[in-house]
Amino acid sequence: YLQGAGKINNVKLRGASVDLSYLQQDSAAYKYNNAKAQWQLLNHNNNGYLYGDGFNAVGTLHISGSLNKDLAVGITPRFAWDKDEHGDASLVEGYAKTHLGVWGITAGRQPMSWGVGRAGQLAFGSNATPQTAIKLNLLEPHTFDNGALKFLGKANVNVFASRLEGNRVASSGSALEKNHAAFVGVRVDIMPTDAFTFGLERMSMLKKFNKHWLLGDNADDAEKDNWNDIAGLDFKYRFPGVQVYASLYGEDQAHAFPCENAYNVGMYFPQLVPDGSWDLRVEGAKTNDAWYGHWVLKNGWTYKDAILGDWLGADAKRVYAEVNHYLADVGKLGLSY
């Protein structure tokens, strides 16, 4: 729509869903050791939504489309009911998107997930409430047609900026925290071939923007440490019949390079049978004890009491497997472990 294609002014209901669930656990939510966040059993990567005890009913509407050839909008309201809190309404996403030259510009709230992994993304996924942000992205990947960089093939760029909650000082109990700290990210995806994608990513919580952040010169003094970083790289390769992917990320920095590493690896088989009605995914992930915490920004790598990255948390390992059977015109049946 943003390039003038398609019908003008076609905002309409694109879909609706109802989620029925029942939750019974010892606590309403469990807490992490080194970050101010919480989690629930079997409820992850759900845009920060926590179920109430007992029966829950959640309905969502997906409305989107273009207002004209230069402006598209989207809104996803969510309506929930549980026996503890009764009725509740919230906004999963609400955004407007336009363009300037080769750049797409998005303003508003929209769920984003960067990196590879089905069970969770190490730096930034859909585990926490979506933030209101400004985002820039290339409308089409840039092609390196000739010259020394031709071997890179194509590249895409995504950049965003938002700010965190206004109660982070009070919730952490530390005067060194920062209310409404800036949260910024940049990701570059490089595609040397149609089968291979290589990604580079850096995300930062910023108390103050200065040259030291640009150079990666982190301070040893708590009074002068002004940011919390996660950065790293990932890749995906599409072989015939199987996709292989992995990522290696570092929590905070040492001498301009990420350290305190974590990783995930995975394999996806999109067609276990010739008709494509079955697929299989297997993943593994590991973090160390430094992940998602910070010695100055005590809330850690969180937003509204949820980890911004992988719900796995710090000092943890995970093995994940999922098999799905797709039913024609009905949906799918899945089993995960």
Placement of each model-derived feature along the sequence:
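N-terminal periplasmic/intermembrane-space "pro-region" immediately following the signal or transit peptide
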Residues: Y1-N46
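Extracellular/periplasm-exposed beta-strand and loop segments of Gram-negative cell-envelope proteins
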Residues: L50-Y51, H62, E140, A306-L312
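Surface-exposed loop and membrane-interface regions of Gram-negative outer-membrane beta-barrel proteins
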Residues: Y51-F55, L67-L100, G115-S126, A256-F257
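Signature for the C-terminal beta-barrel architecture of outer-membrane proteins
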Residues: D70, S113, A133-D305, A314-Y326, ...
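Long, hydrophobic, well-ordered secondary-structure blocks that form the structural core
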Residues: R109-N137
